[in-house]
A protein has these predicted regions:
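Conserved, well-structured interaction surfaces
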Residues: 4-8, 12-20, 38-114, 130-165, ...
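An aromatic- and glycine-enriched ligand-binding surface/loop that stacks and positions planar moieties
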Residues: 2-40, 149-153, 171-174, 179-369, ...
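Structural register within alpha-helical repeat arrays
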Residues: 96, 103, 177, 184, ...
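C-terminal substrate/ligand-recognition segments
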Residues: 310-448
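Short coil/linker segments at helix-helix boundaries
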Residues: 116-138, 187-201
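Long, intrinsically disordered, low-complexity segments
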Residues: 68-69, 144-146, 225-291, 406-416, ...
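Short coil/turn linking the two alpha-helices of tandem helical-hairpin repeats
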Residues: 111-118, 180-192, 432-435
Length: 565
């Protein structure tokens, strides 16, 4: 068991904060960070602008994941002693495969962040010349990573009886190939580096093996539309949940965390902007600007949410209003306005605030001490469960956990690799290889939509007019940008929505070469009258100037302006 104990620290890669899909931390410092960097989310400060959009990211002399003396050194030490061990040949191959997986997983991040990096595959001493060697070109390093992952796939054994459940196995390696093949293949394609097909083909191959092994999606237990989607991040035990390949287990008194707790407090700083809200389809499968969308408009928050993709309800707290009861401020009753209960009826009623409470995501909400949140939107920055855009992000929120007086009482497991990402990898890689059709859509995107309660994608219906607000990518020396292919845009939309809040955004917009489109748009909130905006110490966005209309502007209503000029 020495080899196991020596390798356990490598599992900390999945909670390493230099990796944007890291499960460590919460709020803007946890998995949301990658999607905040991508412009999908905002911080609820007046000065909470995107560092990449405003070019305020400071360079650092060290760190940011440029590290070969921690994980890489540990892995190389283990690998260097395998041949001298008394293990069987099968055991040696197994542990070499585990080492190759972790070595490759760390290098996947190094390549994404730095491009060309040193290739360190042996134990280095202080006087080793390799310790001060040059960077190796991106292609060579990426080829090495893919080669090692494929070797690991072919040689890892089934040692669950020795390693334990929920440890690195063949399926984890296939999930890494699926992710890396798509990431590197599309980066190479859109950055005109060539030799991208083999990465995309490997992504497809690995994805299809996993799709055969994990044919079922989790549908949840709490009964709301898209419950399986929402409960993937709020479930106590993921060990028996369909589609889970690897997960982070949290246990009371051992390693509890506070991702749900923080979203019940005033310290949760993550909100969604209007542009990202606009990406969510209608339940009929149409973009909101499609001529057949039946969109209800965004001049009223109830209308904005009506008949939308239910995954939106599990990511942003839906609007409502109730009358608070007396005494402990935990009971409530419905208002006389029928519209105020529309989304309470959809999500299920939190009949009386308690700690722990009822179910997963229920309305009305409650804070960390089980005090009632009487209405959403709830604008501001100081009180609990507030935000400035009106779109409060609550992906990790649940009622069933204890969220009282301490940030580290939550024990809901969190996924690391799951089949939903694999389905999206398959769809996108197939398109980039010229092989996406209705059959592929039905095996991938339409499985996700069926669970969410959204109409299926019909490839033949998607033309240049399907979404008048299609995004642009920016080839080299083309500042004007080029509209993304209509079908590819819908594939990417599905990825953005399904993986929202999981940290993939910054990886994706860069490999797609779409960062300017996502980052350079004005960050706005819900539609509001000027009087209501000013009463909340906010102003309106003026589309003619691209800035705030100010306190003395002429606009009577408009979208909330989120940041200082």
């Amino acid at each position: 068991y020495k080899r196991q104990a020596f390798m356990w620290p490598c599992y900390e890669m999945f909670t390493n904060n230099t990796i944007r899909t890291s499960l460590n931390g919460w709020g803007q410092n946890g998995p949301y960070k990658g999607d905040m960097d991508a412009g999908y989310f905002e911080q609820k400060y007046e000065s909470g602008y995107n560092d990449f959009a405003y070019q305020t990211v400071a360079s650092v002399a060290s760190g940011n994941g440029w590290n070969f003396s921690s994980f890489i050194r540990r892995i190389n030490i283990m690998l260097s002693h395998i041949d001298d061990s008394e293990m069987t040949e099968a055991q040696k191959n197994h542990w070499r495969a585990v080492g190759y997986f972790f070595h490759s997983f760390w290098y996947m991040e190094l390549i994404d962040r730095f491009g060309a990096v040193p290739w360190v595959d042996q134990v280095l001493q202080e006087d080793s010349p390799e310790a001060y060697g040059p960077r190796i070109d991106r292609k060579t390093v990426a080829d090495n990573v893919l080669e090692r992952l494929k070797w690991a796939e072919e040689n890892i054994g089934d040692f669950t009886s020795e390693d334990g459940k929920n440890t690195i196995n063949k399926d984890c390696i296939l999930a890494a190939i699926s992710r890396f093949g798509l990431r590197e293949g599309t980066w190479r394609k859109y950055h005109e580096l060539g030799d991208y097909d083999k990465y995309l083909q490997e992504s497809v191959r690995a994805s299809e093996l996993l799709m055969s092994a994990y044919p079922t999606l989790y549908t949840g237990t709490d009964g709301q539309p898209a419950a399986g989607y929402g409960e993937m991040w709020t479930t106590e035990d993921l060990s028996t949940v369909p589609g889970i390949i690897l997960y982070k287990e949290y246990v009371t008194d051992i390693n509890p965390m506070g991702t749900s707790y923080i979203e019940h407090t005033s310290s949760h700083y993550v909100e969604m902007n209007q542009k990202t809200v606009d990406l969510y389809l209608m339940k009929n499968g149409k973009p909101i600007l499609n001529a057949e969308s039946e969109y209800h408009g965004d001049k009223d928050m109830y209308a904005t949410f009506r008949d939308r993709d239910p995954r939106m309800y599990h990511t942003i707290m839906p609007p409502y209003k109730v009358k608070a009861g007396g005494g402990t401020y935990r009971t409530w009753s419905y208002t006389d306005n029928e519209a105020d209960r529309e989304y309470i009826d959809i999500m299920g009623a939190n009949t009386s605030c308690s700690n722990p409470g009822i179910g997963m995501k229920r309305l009305p909400g409650q804070n960390w001490s089980a005090s009632l949140v009487p209405e959403i939107p709830r604008l501001g920055t100081g009180a609990f469960v507030t935000c400035r855009s009106g779109y409060y992000v609550w992906k990790n929120w649940d009622n069933w956990e204890t969220n009282f007086n301490n940030g580290n009482l939550n024990t809901a497991d969190k996924p690391i690799f799951k089949i939903e990402e694999v389905l999206l990898n398959e769809a996108e890689a197939k398109f980039e290889l010229g092989n996406f059709d209705q059959g592929v859509a039905d095996k991938t995107i339409n499985k996700l939509r069926e669970r969410a309660g959204v109409a299926r994608m019909v490839v033949a219906e998607i033309d240049a007019n399907f979404d008048p607000n299609r995004g642009k990518y920016y080839p080299k020396n083309n500042d004007a940008g080029v509209e993304v292919d209509p079908v590819l845009w819908e594939i990417r939309r599905e990825r953005i929505i399904e993986l929202m809040g999981e940290g993939f955004g910054f990886y994706d917009i860069r490999r797609w070469r779409m960062a300017p489109w996502f980052l350079n748009r004005p960050a706005t909130g819900i539609w509001m009258s000027k009087a209501d905006a000013l009463s909340n110490n906010m102003t309106l966005y003026n589309p003619e100037t691209g800035y705030s209309d100010g306190t003395s502007g002429t606009m009577a209503e408009g979208y909330l302006y989120l940041f200082n000029d």
